[in-house]
Amino acid sequence: LAWSIVDETNKVLASGTEQFPAVEYYGRKYIEPNIHMPSNLPADKVNVKLKLTLTESGVTLSQNEYGLLVARKEWNIGQVTASKKILLLDKDHMKVTLDFLDIACQTVPSIKELLNAKQKANLCIISGLKECTDEEARLLREYQSKGGRILFLNSKEAAQKVYPEYITGWIIPTEGDIVVMERYDAPVFDGIGALELRYFNNNKREIPLACHATLKANRNENVTELAGQMRIHAYIDGGKPEDRIQKIESMRGLTLLQIKDGKGTATVSTLCTEKADTDPIAGK
């Protein structure tokens, strides 16, 4: 079994071979080839292919190739100016991820401390928060309306509590490995290709989820749909056009949206950003 990783010009960046054991008639054998990613890349971010060729006595028995996206760790590290003051209410160890990305932040124990005017934060991040009181929701809306910027990371319960007129619920997808951009021109996607919000890697043998949930949201001039996810295998039965539209809407949801309120903005994300230390797009 010969393997190679090649760039878009078919230049070999890394390669190797593995001996494949004999397979009995109608049998099956598995091996785990020792594939090394290239130590040097021609650019910070590169589209490559993993090519596999199985030969016996010089005769090719099988060939396969797989598209991959690889990047240097420096590509998305240190992208936030150190002078920006970022506060983090951390309920799911997001501080570790931000440290990896070299994003300086200060953790706080509560929403009240997060919104303390004396902190003069440029951005408030709420990560992994599942419970939010009515008073905390009111304080968050008040803070945002005065010009505050808030980022909700995998805090769907809290986000719905804060924005009940916009976020009506959520779905835990059975197929959460592919996310699609709704606004390709949004600055949040700078440096990311249109088809790259998928198959987020965490070096584990499991479905490579790109999102944890899809949000059901009302269309409104204050809501900007940035990215979404929908079931990719389903039957759309007959009926009136409006019935089919409703059926399609029931199978899709948002994974990234921005909400305007007064002078401020809030971004709500259900993307698997915790994979930033193993997936370059998740980190970006």
Regions found by a protein language model. Name each.
Residues T9, G16-E18, N64:
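Short hydrophobic alpha-helix segments
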Residues L13-Y25:
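Solvent-exposed serine/threonine-rich low-complexity stretches and specific carbohydrate-binding patches
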Residues K45-N47, S57-L123, S127, N154-A158, ...:
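Aromatic-Pro/Gly-enriched surface loop or interdomain linker
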Residues S83-K84, Q119-N122, K146-R149, G262-T265:
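Loop/turn elements at helix/coil->beta-strand transitions in domains of secreted/extracellular proteins
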Residues K130-T214:
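A glycine-rich, often tryptophan-bearing local segment used as a flexible ligand/cofactor-contacting loop or short
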Residues P173-T174, D185-D237, R244-G262, T270-K275:
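Extended, composition-driven regions rather than compact fold-specific motifs
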